[in-house]
Amino acid sequence: MEAMTPEEYLMQVKNIDLRICSLEGELHDAENENDTEYVEELRQTIKQDIEKHKELKFRIRNEIQQLPDNRLSTLLIEYYVKGKSWEMVAAALGLKDEKNVRLSLREKALKLFAAHYPKYFLYYSDLHILT
């Protein structure tokens, strides 16, 4: 695995969602142009991406659920896995200040994730986790 930050690692789920949406738009355009060969290529690519997305989402969700802090793991799942906005994440945590969630709690959650999986993020392994 290529060296990534915890944020980049978790963003893989959101990024593949964006790719699938883009390909679906391209598929729609190709269908309108009756380009059957290209339509079939796009369908196969989308199918492969969806399979990859399911596996990645399942793995990352399981890794997050192993974290000892339920509040921080909920934050990571709501934002990175479920793709919710920071406002929705704050509401899921029972908080009103989305800015605090986005800036402060997110940083704590990412540090906790990095500390829990040092094999992925060796240069984060010596970070002090704020409590």
Where are the regions a protein language model picked out?
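Short amphipathic alpha helix immediately N-terminal
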Residues: L67-K84
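N-terminal interaction/assembly modules
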Residues: M1-Q66, E87, G94, E107, ...
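Major-groove recognition helix of helix-turn-helix-like DNA-binding domains
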Residues: L75, E98-L112
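Alpha-helix boundary/capping and short turn/kink residues
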Residues: D69, L95-E98
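Hydrophobic positions on the alpha-helical face of helix-turn-helix-like DNA-binding modules
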Residues: L75-L76, V89-A91
